[in-house]
């Protein structure tokens, strides 16, 4: 990678040219094969990179600059269009290689099903893994119209994998009644509507544990993030999400990886959704990578 590519919009701003020297690897997962409403999130990773050139490199939230963190933007995984299972297998294989290389994986989606193979790779490396999940939707279905590979299923899958007591969902305001009932019955940690305040209560309980954080951009109210596939009114503000990212940064949990998914820029001609997403990525880089 040439030096000037760090400001080209082809990679996330200020990306380091060396994979070997970088602690973090940013990678895209341009998949939206299973969405139930509006497609387009496969274009999210590229647009987040493009608009990142408008970011300041300094975070007043964390008093750090991007210069202080070495991260490499690997581009997008070349997923086979329309083949969900093969795409998921490729994501799991790639993330497993990053973990073997002792990298911090930071994924850009893409629909939320892309998180499922990441969860599997993470659980293999970290037996005591916990999940922090911020989203408008429960994502607790076993299947959608008979199809188990759906963006409405990844949190149910990870509950079955690591135990529902190790999964913490915040900002939830949409889902089937049966999903909410199931979460309550099995002891999953599901917090409706809000993110920051319940998160502050949970973080001390997770001190010292390896935690993977997955953020669906639709946790935000559509006024703050119209560019997503399945809009849900009544969400949180971009400030609350920023404050939540900072709260995690200031906690004693061990964040071992993260993703930001469901940005669909085609529905947001002002670019406010990918612009917000790029800022969230900046704070994740500066706050979560130790």
UniProtKB/Swiss-Prot annotation:
Mn(2+) binds at residues 112, 135, 137, 139, 216, 218. It comes from the Bacteria. The keyword Calcium does not apply. It catalyses: agmatine + H2O = urea + putrescine. Keywords: Hydrolase, Manganese, Metal-binding, Polyamine biosynthesis, Putrescine biosynthesis, Spermidine biosynthesis. Its cofactor is Mn(2+). SUPFAM superfamilies: Arginase/deacetylase (SSF52768). It is an enzyme of class 3 (hydrolase). PROSITE patterns: ARGINASE_1, ARGINASE_2. InterPro entries: Agmatinase-rel, Ureohydrolase, Ureohydrolase_dom_sf, Ureohydrolase_Mn_BS. The keyword RNA-binding does not apply. Pfam families: Arginase. Pathway: Amine and polyamine biosynthesis; putrescine biosynthesis via agmatine pathway; putrescine from agmatine: step 1/1. Its EC number is 3.5.3.11. Gene3D superfamilies: Ureohydrolase domain (3.40.800.10). GO terms for molecular function: agmatinase activity; metal ion binding. One of its GO terms (biological process) is putrescine biosynthetic process from arginine, via agmatine. Belongs to the arginase family. Agmatinase subfamily. Catalyzes the formation of putrescine from agmatine. This is Agmatinase. It comes from Bacillus cereus (strain ATCC 14579 / DSM 31 / CCUG 7414 / JCM 2152 / NBRC 15305 / NCIMB 9373 / NCTC 2599 / NRRL B-3711).
